[in-house]
Amino acid sequence: MSLSNDTNNDPHILEIMNNEIPFVQFDKIAKLIPSSKVIINDRKAAQEAVQHLIDMGCKKIAHIRGLENPQNAIDRFMGYKTALEKNGIPFDSKLVYPCKEITFEQGVEFAKQILEEDKGIDGIFVITDLVAVGVLAHFNEKGIRVPEDIAVIGFSNWLVSQVITPKLSTVDQPSYEMGVAAFNLLLEEIVQRKKGKGFEPKIVELATQVIVSESTLRKK
């Protein structure tokens, strides 16, 4: 089970637990629900993405963050803040742009807003590639040079990140491996329950990697 971005509470999950139905959470999870989980360290991955922008010379970095409730959006926001703090860059809440929905159109709208406000932003960490591609599309339309004027990095490593111009730097989230691990955990729980044995929930954490591409790779 991967929670919807619109999920605000967990009673339906608790009902599954109370009925002893085997299930595994992956990707978007409810941390406090005691089930098996397949996760990545969103906070660490986001911190590494923002650190890459800083290493490329960015000093005023915006964050297009996800919705308020999903745990992965919260963790990525915290990773953004941690990277700034570790590099002595003051956090500015005015550089955080919360999505109302995770869409290409949101990326376009925030790109417009960033250009109109003209705050001197030179780097953007975006919650996910779909939104980041919207940002790049608008910057391309307006003649903004990426990464020379503004560097952009996304998250997820969707196929779309490699077909946009410039190619999008992103964080590789191992989706296939996540699916395999979730299936194996679910199968293990089903087998154990059929044998009448108790089952201790397990947590599998998969590694992520910053994929450096054209949207951040500045010439030094």
Predicted regions located by residue number:
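Structural motif
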Residues: 1-5, 67
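Bacterial carbohydrate/catabolite-sensing allosteric modules
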Residues: 10-220
